Amino acid sequence: MKGSLMRVCFYTLGCKVNLNETGALEQMFRGAGFTIVPEGEEADVFVVNSCTVTNFGDQKSRKWLRRAKRENPGAVTVLTGCYPQAFPEEAAQFMEADLVCGNGDRKAILDNVLKLLDGHERIVAVTPHQRGELFEELPVERFETHTRAFIKVEDGCNRQCAYCVIPRARGPVRSRAEDSILKELRQLAASGYREVVLSAISLPSYGLDTGTNLVELVEKCAQVEGIERIRLGSLDPDMLTPEFITRLAAVEKLCPQFHLSLQSGCTSTLRRMRRVYTAEQYAQVVDQIRAAYGERPVSFTTDCICGFPGETQADFEESCAFLKKIGFLKVHVFPYSRRSGTPAYDFPAQVHEREKQARSREMNALAEEVRREVLAAHVGTEDEVLLETPLSETLFTGYTRLYIPVVVSAPGHKSGEIVHVRLGEYDGERVRAALC
């Protein structure tokens, strides 16, 4: 059965790499004649691109597919991504999914879906990761619901953090060929994209397996005509050398917003997590970045785990104090999720779930307080905004180069354009801005 006149709905969980990979799948299905439909509409095929960082992510994937199957009993349902790759036996038992496939099997998804639409029996296809495997090329020419483009430049992680299942889900570091990245970037620029996000599982590891490095890639991306803003995904602070920082600061097109992975602001907790930096070293990297930018503004975002095994109240308070010290624009706070197959699963002194949730709520409140202080310091300053979601004919949401969320009235402009604005007050969700 061909895909002509058939509809497919995608649901994406997790990181920007998943967004990129979903974009590639959408392109694949669109090329076969399928129509992409949003959530809530009837479809012939439902695909969830899963995230398995937490147990909650697995639960959301299963819940979404159950609902899709219940509301569309004749549809084909697909479970792909990190969940089935990391836990193939568990995912295979989830019978609401007609197709279960891992991260290395995405190129076969369309063919397998067409087989299922023609009456083929249920398919489970999860290929284990292997040493020496190559980067899977999944180019994307446009994204259905985004005005910024995401380019996947690397996959895999060689680290072994005590809490993390991602190396199991993503395999070893594999870097994408530079020529392939630049070719896709030029195509995206020709399609009208002005901002690109370089996404990866371990972004600073780019080039470790190919003899190049991330900063060289950024410098070459900045030479592509039509691309006005380059944004980086998550960075590990221990991999940012002074030379690396200095060279990045010299790239004018690079958005000066750095997502530096923290996980805890307490050094003893970081050691138990098997992170390879201390809180003090993290702060030094932040200082080096600020020094490299001089009087130019720079912002920092991060992730933080609450309730890691062995975390005392004093450790938690130390982590909170560190968040205030750095002055993060945004902190993604989440309670520790106990993942089977990771060293931390068997660690002693597991923190009770109620306490993890309580600490997460407290840290979230603190992070919002710090966010308000950071945004208050930007009132009256000017920046550029990429117009994104239109709220009306003239009102848009968007983000500045610093990743400050704004709402601005921009008559005569449209989504995807970059405009110059003056920042106003924060309303609890976005900063109100005005065209300059």
Model feature map: region roles:
Residues 7, 72-73, 224-231:
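Short, surface-exposed connector motifs at secondary-structure boundaries
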Residues 190, 215-216, 223-224, 229, ...:
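Radical SAM/AdoMet-radical enzyme domain recognition
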Residues 210-222, 242-256, 311-328, 353-358, ...:
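Short, electropositive alpha-helical surface patch
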Residues 160, 164-171, 203, 229-238, ...:
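Conserved strand-turn element in the central/C-terminal portion of the radical SAM core barrel
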